[in-house]
Amino acid sequence: QGTANEIAIRGLLHATSPMTVMNVTGPETVSIKKVSEKLGKYLGKKPIFEGEEGNDAYLNDASLAMEIFGYPDVCAETLIRWQAEYILDGGRTLNKPTHFEERKGNY
């Protein structure tokens, strides 16, 4: 969240009218299945998947954000490991569904 918060504040300097669309996400394209498997490995658990993988996916193009703000200081691999450490250390979770199966943008 640190990088996203920093970009949100720094982004005010780049506000335009009419607006410019800018996706703020990591530079890597990551598979939810692969991330789940990696997180499960850190946690000593095997993820359980329901349903079938879709033939399409939502991808965000963060190239404009990367051009303006640079690459984040923390890579996806480190974020996954940190999340596992947080959970293993007894960190609080909200136990809410992820809605990764959502295909119409209604979260």
Residue ranges and their predicted role:
Residues 2-64, 100-107:
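Mid/C-terminal beta-alpha module of Rossmann-like enzyme folds, strongest
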Residues 66-76:
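A polyampholytic, Gly/Pro-enriched intrinsically disordered region
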Residues 1-9, 77-84:
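Short, amphipathic alpha-helical "lid/cap" segments that border enzyme active or binding sites
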Residues 63, 76-107:
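Amphipathic terminal alpha-helices
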Residues 12, 43, 73, 84-88:
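Residue-level detector of secondary-structure transition/capping positions
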Residues 17-18, 71, 93:
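A general structural signal for well-ordered secondary-structure junctions
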